[in-house]
Amino acid sequence: MEKVLVLLLVALSVAYAAPGPRGIVINLEEGELCLNSAQCKSGCCHHSSALSLARCAPKASENSECSPQTIYGVYYKCPCERGLTCEGDKSIVGSITNTNFGVCLDV
């Protein structure tokens, strides 16, 4: 009985000592360095220029500039929040040159 009690106390102390949900590789907060949007809590890995480091950023709100979601997962402009659509250039040239920015609209 005494061993069971000690084991229970050890298990509880380990459970309380475990770190919170903050991640090192995934579940990153806004402003932390990222390589892909899947790593960010917000769902957007953003960089301002080709030479800048990408950081997690909030998704674009209504009437803000946006980029359509891509398979690459790193954006110059973040995609729209849930329920909004990015209305803008949908050409192949725009997606190749990364100039296919639009505006988030509630359609």
Swiss-Prot record:
Which residues are the signal sequence here? 1-17
Where does the protein end up?
Secreted
ATP-binding as a keyword of this entry, yes or no, is: no
What tissues contain this protein?
Answer: Expressed by the pancreas.
A GO CC annotation given for this chain: extracellular region
InterPro entries registered for this protein in UniProt? CLPS_chr, Colipase, Colipase_C, Colipase_CS, Colipase_N
Q: Name one GO biological process term.
A: lipid catabolic process
Q: Which residues form the propeptide?
A: 18-22
SS bond partners: 34-45, 40-56, 44-78, 66-86, 80-104
Q: A Pfam family matched by this chain, by name?
A: Colipase
Would you say which domain of life the source belongs to?
Answer: Eukaryota
**PANTHER family on file:** COLIPASE (PTHR10041:SF8)
Its function, per the record, reads: Colipase is a cofactor of pancreatic lipase. It allows the lipase to anchor itself to the lipid-water interface. Without colipase the enzyme is washed off by bile salts, which have an inhibitory effect on the lipase. Enterostatin has a biological activity as a satiety signal.
Q: How does it assemble?
A: Forms a 1:1 stoichiometric complex with pancreatic lipase.
Q: Which family does it belong to?
A: Belongs to the colipase family.
What is the protein name stated in its UniProt record?
Answer: Colipase
Q: Its gene?
A: CLPS
